[in-house]
Amino acid sequence: MIFTAXDRSAIEXV
């Protein structure tokens, strides 16, 4: 799970 701007907008692996 990778959070870019603290949001769940840019999550990889999910």
Curated annotation (Swiss-Prot):
Localized where?
Answer: Microsome; Endoplasmic reticulum
Q: Which GO terms describe its cellular component?
A: endoplasmic reticulum; intracellular membrane-bounded organelle
Q: Which UniProt keywords apply?
A: Endoplasmic reticulum, Microsome
Q: Which residues cross the membrane?
A: none
The protein's name: 13.2 kDa protein
Taxonomic source organism: Scyliorhinus canicula (Small-spotted catshark)
Looking at the record's lineage, which domain of life comes first?
Answer: Eukaryota
